[in-house]
UniProtKB/Swiss-Prot annotation:
Disruption phenotype: Five day old adults display increased levels of hyperoxidized forms of peroxiredoxins, and both males and females show increased locomotor activity. No effect on lifespan under normal or oxidative stress conditions. The lineage of its organism: Eukaryota, Metazoa, Ecdysozoa, Arthropoda, Hexapoda. InterPro entries: ParB/Sulfiredoxin_dom, ParB/Sulfiredoxin_sf, Sulfiredoxin. It comes from the Eukaryota. CDD domains: Srx. Contributes to oxidative stress resistance by reducing cysteine-sulfinic acid formed under exposure to oxidants in a peroxiredoxin. May catalyze the reduction in a multi-step process by acting both as a specific phosphotransferase and a thioltransferase. This is Sulfiredoxin. Gene3D superfamilies: Conserved hypothetical protein from pyrococcus furiosus pfu- 392566-001, ParB domain. GO terms for cellular component: cytoplasm; cytosol. One of its GO terms (biological process) is cellular oxidant detoxification. Its EC number is 1.8.98.2. It is an enzyme of class 1 (oxidoreductase). Transmembrane segments: none annotated.
Amino acid sequence: MEFISHFLRATSRRTAALGPILQRNRSEIIQKQSLTNRQAFRRYRSSCSTMDTTVHSAGIDETHLVPMSVIQRPIPSVLDEQKVQSLMETIKNETSEDEVPPIDLLWISGSEGGDYYFSFGGCHRFEAYKRLQRPTIKAKLVKSTLGDLYHYMGSSAPKYLA
């Protein structure tokens, strides 16, 4: 308790000179701050392209065409049929295919040099490409580790990859 009170006293001495500023209506200050934060977030969000919408791949610009056959999807998808059909129509049309964002793939290099690709999101896009029998799908590769994979799969994650 002595340790904490030391810092509280030091803080209170520093802020004593700010008397008139601290007497302002706190809710007014909080409202201004949150409004400013919301405006900044909206500006940031509108400046981002639609392709950079995921947490994992927001900083990755490079898109690859990855063979569907090498992608592992360990968690079964729960799909909205209308969404899959809509995506299929968009993908079929060559001019609008670019509107479909790439999926994120966790890319894990095996201990003996093999590459493994795991997909946990993009279920509807993956299913649309699969039903259209496309050999490849647009993807952003997120370099990952077995530890990252463990976060998704828990104890079902493989202990090692060759």
